């Protein structure tokens, strides 16, 4: 048998890669193939609703602007539903529900009403102020503020005190000084600075309460101390513009070894203006858009920029008896505006009371140069 002859293989210069044979895997008909997830696992779906609500409560209570909360509503359908939970709405911060006056609409009104129904004290106070002063729904606005005041909401207590002092929404005979002092005392007990200052003036002047000058002075000093403490705790860096004294230093008088502590209200320590509450900012913007300093019908706005309250009848507010230009809804607003602005602008005029627009009987008494005792009703 002849040996087999080996043939020579001829290779070309072109390289062709080999192909792997496909393996056929039989998938049972009862098992459906798992779809590919190109975006990764959604971890939010694995978090229980209770935990998400707890996180949203923390977010809402610390929000610095409405956008912080609105962005959550725009994230997804689940977060929007959980964010509108009454537990979350009841704990929203004042800045989270701070509605702009030029953005006021039926939707924002419904949102505030929904927060009120959820039990938010801030929403009760804010919507109450808007309805009482802007929408002129006096009864409903006062009831909303009273609802917040019953739960010891300090700004609502103070606002009701201002209404009682002025008889807002009624006639001059509707003033209830004793009720105003009682509401003011409750707000002052809760640490409200304006209420402390207002109560101090009432005690000093015997306005709605037996006169007690020393106790009134103590409340005024406490109000200034709390005002300074709020600035220091807010983290604002020390600047010479507010650390310096607003008045020239008094002459040096020998004190015979006694330690003296100058009172802030006497020496006018320049601190930044307190932050305006969103409700007061809404009032100021609302009437600025609709007529500036005159809401209409001869009514006037409180001259303190951080207030925004309008008169509900002619000559309701106190007027400066030196210049007759500025008007104030309360002694607290008058004292703050004096420190911040009016003491540089106030100038006496020739008996402006003779013009026949003297208000409701306000005269000037001797003060201490800091605006604490500029206005005093005669009644």
From Swiss-Prot:
Zn(2+) 1 binds at residues 304, 307, 329, 333. Zn(2+) 2 binds at residues 320, 323, 342, 346. GO terms for biological process: protein ubiquitination. Keywords: Metal-binding, Nucleus, Ubl conjugation pathway, Zinc, Zinc-finger. GO terms for cellular component: nucleus. Residues 41-92 form the F-box domain. GO terms for molecular function: zinc ion binding. Coiled coil: none annotated. It is found in: Nucleus. Its main location: nucleus. Residues 358-379 are annotated as: Disordered. A zinc finger (MYND-type) spans 304-346. It comes from the Eukaryota. Part of a SCF (ASK-cullin-F-box) protein ligase complex. Interacts with SKP1A/ASK1, SKP1B/ASK2, ASK4, ASK11 and ASK13. Component of SCF(ASK-cullin-F-box) E3 ubiquitin ligase complexes, which may mediate the ubiquitination and subsequent proteasomal degradation of target proteins. This is F-box protein At1g67340.
